A protein has these predicted regions:
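Contiguous segments within soluble domain cores/interaction surfaces
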Residues: 1-106
Length: 106
């Protein structure tokens, strides 16, 4: 069995006050079903910038994510289901870790 390290990825959402919203992370990869990532912490600064740390891609260990390109999309959603902000990052997934961030989205 492959032993995976725990990848950490930071995404930042700007321009919206995310206080009180639920933040969800979705990992998408080449025509496969999207996978929910675990959002472990959300911090806010004085300018309502939120930094979310994804400390665990829960399905990497079961083969849900494969080597190669993937996109992580971050969505903040109000209790009423309204989406406030979205941020995306393209990543390169290696044998047992995230190799690098390829590009920043909006």
């Amino acid at each position: 069995m492959i032993q995976w390290t725990t990848p950490t990825l930071r995404l930042t959402v700007r321009g919206a006050d995310l206080t009180g919203t639920d933040v969800h992370a979705t990992i998408k990869q080449g025509g496969r079903d999207p996978i929910e990532g675990e959002v472990t912490s959300v911090t806010y600064d004085a300018e309502a910038e939120a930094t979310v740390v994804l400390a665990d891609f829960t399905q990497v260990q079961t083969g849900g994510i494969r080597k190669g390109d993937a996109t992580v999309q971050l969505n903040s959603v109000t209790a009423e289901g309204k989406r406030l902000a979205t941020s995306e990052k393209r990543i390169e997934v290696g044998d047992n870790h995230i190799k690098e961030v390829l590009a920043y989205g909006s």
